[in-house]
């Protein structure tokens, strides 16, 4: 399983290539295979970096250290491409990205996904779904799933917003507002 964070952590002192090589080799060993030679790994990494439109210079930079939001998300999508999990949870991968960066992220996820990888995309915006058509759409409000449907539900939410959902589930909407108020209070007191 792979988890893509809304706000990826910076890890100074660990460069991207070394982090990915160690992760990749750990996965190989876990699957009963031998570790890959560093030169062979570099070839695989270079190819995957092209797949996610990432400049090779990022191999030597520390993991997410000083990266822009778009660079962090691309680095995370590169990790997803290299590790090829059976299932991935992408938590607001589009958060803080401009329209071009969201498009690149969406296209990259579509290129590396496939029938052998389940992906749960958590998003507030439909643009990330342009190249990743959902089989199922679930709406979470107040900490619970209140409505489910297919891609048409995602399209409806994009066009009409969440007002219908909030009105249809007033208890969940009230719980959501209370959770938001608590988060704001925590932010101002910390």
Question: Which sequence ranges carry the predicted segments?
Answer:
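Walker B catalytic motif
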Residues: 92-93, 100
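Helical segment within the ABC ATPase nucleotide-binding domain
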Residues: 102-115
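ABC-family P-loop ATPase nucleotide-binding domains
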Residues: 5-85
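Conserved D-loop-proximal element of ABC-family nucleotide-binding domains
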Residues: 98-103, 148
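Conserved H-loop
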Residues: 116-132
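Walker B motif beta-strand of ABC-family P-loop ATPases
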Residues: 86-92
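Conserved beta-strand-loop-alpha-helix hinge in the C-terminal portion
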Residues: 140, 144-167
């Amino acid at each position: 399983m792979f988890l893509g964070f809304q706000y990826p952590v910076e890890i100074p002192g660990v460069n991207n290539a070394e982090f990915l090589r160690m992760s990749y080799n750990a996965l190989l060993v876990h699957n009963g295979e031998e570790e890959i030679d560093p030169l062979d790994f570099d070839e695989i990494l270079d190819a995957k970096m092209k797949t996610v439109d990432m400049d090779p210079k990022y191999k030597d930079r520390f993991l997410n250290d000083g990266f822009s939001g778009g660079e962090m998300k691309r680095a995370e999508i590169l990790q997803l491409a290299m590790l090829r999990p059976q299932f991935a949870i992408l938590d607001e991968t589009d958060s803080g990205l401009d329209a071009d960066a969201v498009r690149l992220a969406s296209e990259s996820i579509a290129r590396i996904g496939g029938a052998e990888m389940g992906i749960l995309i958590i998003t507030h915006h439909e643009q990330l779904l342009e190249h990743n058509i959902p089989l199922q759409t679930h709406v979470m409000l107040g900490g619970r799933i209140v409505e489910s449907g297919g891609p048409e539900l995602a399209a409806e939410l994009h066009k009409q917003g969440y007002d219908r959902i909030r009105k249809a589930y007033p208890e969940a909407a009230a719980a959501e507002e209370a959770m938001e108020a608590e988060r704001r209070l925590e932010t101002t007191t910390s």
